[in-house]
Every structure is written in C-alpha cells, then in structure tokens.
Amino acid sequence: MKVQRIEVENKPYPLYLLLDKEYQLIEPVMKFIKYLDNTGKSPNTIKAYCYHLKLLYEFMEQRGVILNDINFELLADFVGWLRYPSASNVIDLQSKKAIREETTVNTILNVVMSFLDYLSRLGEFKSIDVFKQAKGRNFKGFLHHVNKGRYQKNVLKLRVKKKQIRTLRSKEVKQIIDACHTKRDKLILMLMYEGGLRIGEVLSLRLEDIVTWDNQIHLTPRDVNVNEAYIKLRKERTIHVSKELMSLYTDYLIYEYSEELEHDYVFISLKEGYFGKPLKYQSVLDLVRRIVKRTGIEFTSHMLRHTHATQLIREGWDVAFVQKRLGHAHVQTTLNTYVHLSDQDMKNEFNKYLERKEHKK
C-alpha cells in the first residue's frame, strides 16, 4: 500500500490517493478523497485521511478480506489491531504494549466510519450500526429538551483517560527562547507562545498578513502554499500581539530576511543551499528537538499554545474570547481542553477565599 501525492490540473494544491501493492488505484478511496476535496477539506486533512485508510486496507489484506466483508466484528478486530498489530488473529496482551494511544485509535476509527458512511450513501456498502443511545452529555444543545440528554455513542471507540495538559512555567519559556540561535527561531516560538498559533498557521504567514503599526496578525486561509502549511478549518481570524513581538519581527526582517525573494512567505530557510525557500513543517519539528537537547526541557510546539491558552484563562479571560483567539470551531473544545485546574490553582483560589473571608470580619 502506498499513499501517492498527485498534482491535479486546475487545482492549485496537491491531492493524495491510495495505491495497492500492484500500484493500482483503490477506487473507493479515490471517490472519498474527491468528496473531501469538494466539501472543502484541506490538503493536509486529505493526506491524513489517506494514511488512516491505508491502515484499514493493510488490515484487510492481512486478514484476507475485501471491503464488502467488513462487518461489526471485523471493525472491532481492526480497533484491536491498531493498538496491537499482529500477523495472526491472536493478540498476546501480556507481552506487548499498545503502539497507539486511545485518542489516535479513535481518530483513525472516525475516518474509517466516515469513509464507510460515504460509501453507504452511494449504495456501495451496507451500513454497519456501531452506535447506541447514551446519556451524560457534557454540553446541552439547543434541542436538549427534545432529545432529553440522549446522544449517539460509537460503541467501538476506546475510553480515553482525561489527561492534565502539561504547560510550561514562565522560567522555562524564557530558557527555551534564550536557547534559540536566530531571530527567526525566536519569532517562530514566540508566535506559538504569545499568539497561540499552530505550526501550520505560523508557516502560512505572508508579509502582507502582519500589520506592524497596529500589532496585528491576520491569519488568512489560502489554497496555494508551496510549503504545504495551511490554516486549520480555513477560517480567517486576527490576533493582537505585543510591541516586543513586533519588534522581534522587524529585527528578523532587517538582519536575517532577504529582499530578493520571489515570494512573500515570512519564514524562510537560512541554510546554505536552501536559503530563501519557504520553511516547512519538518524544520520546525527539528528546531524544537534542538531546543529540547540544548535546554533539557521536554516540550512540544503545541505545548507553547497550551501554555498561552492556560495563562489567558488564569488571568480571567472569557472562554469565548479564548476560543476565538485560538481558532477553535466550538467553544466546547476550548472548555474541554483548557479549563483545567491544577492543585496549585486550587490552592491559590482557596487562599484568596480565606483572604476575602478574613477581610469581612
């Protein structure tokens, strides 16, 4: 199985297809990819979907079944196989550790179910019922009084343990920024920390997106990005940043950027032989690895975004404002992800309560 990138005539961005071991196009996946593209999914999302479906077809090949053989039992086996890949139908749970976390397995399962649902709507696959009525929904929708709190739950999805999102202390952030050797690297990490930007959003920035005089950054979705960095959800938004960050941006343009480029991407490679080319996703991942090695601080790029959001909430920002700043589609995502209290948060709030109580005496 192979995921193949292709250039399509009249499309300014690449698409991805799935090929079998004979390098023949897998037609059901091709139809699904076309549907995803027509409904506005980003090239990166389509690429991820292709790789997830590649796993399904590898599983089917190993089991000696075809798509129309897929039933509830095989889907359940597929979920187990994702965690414990095995050449046989027997899984030795005693000697193996799951290679994928529950959240990853659930993400892959969601893609597979969307794929099968699409084929079912075309009349090319028999629908599989994997849902049951459940209670206990966190968020009450507009029609909650009609549904009486019941919703559809996928019984194949794995239970995910609620994890405390790890954030960085201010001292650690300073060490990380100080460990950068270039203004470009400092600016990239500061945009994630102070602006809450994702890697794709940072790398998609063009010179016209940054308004230095008003300390604003416009995040603008574009169909064509040669470095394949895209804004998630394809929604525009504007964030405000500090004068200090804008000053760092200006210094980067003066001392490290080139005026002789044929493009206007903000972040470029500074390596000899590659100088001036738009920076790619892997380069930022490599940067983070270097900083981890230099500082001994274990962190990810997304942890900088987590830290920013958590600090905003601790400072009293309304969750709706945090949602808009981070670019979440739903406020519930912000609530579920960032409204978490550490033991220290609880202690601080209790001490404030005691102070107010003492003041009233």
From Swiss-Prot:
Pfam annotation, one family: Phage_int_SAM_1
List of catalytic residues: R198, K232, H302, R305, H328, Y338 (o-(3'-phospho-dna)-tyrosine intermediate)
CDD domains listed in its UniProt record: INT_tnpA_C_Tn554 (cd01186)
Domain Tyr recombinase: 163-351
GO molecular function: DNA binding
Chain ranges of the Core-binding (CB) domain: 23-120
Keywords: DNA integration, DNA recombination, DNA-binding, Transposable element
GO biological process: DNA integration; DNA recombination
Lineage top rank: taxon: Bacteria
PROSITE patterns hit by this protein: CB, TYR_RECOMBINASE
Family affiliation: Belongs to the 'phage' integrase family.
Biological function: One of three proteins encoded by transposon Tn554 required for its transposition.
Name of the protein in question: Transposase A from transposon Tn554
The organism of origin for this protein: Staphylococcus aureus (strain Mu50 / ATCC 700699)
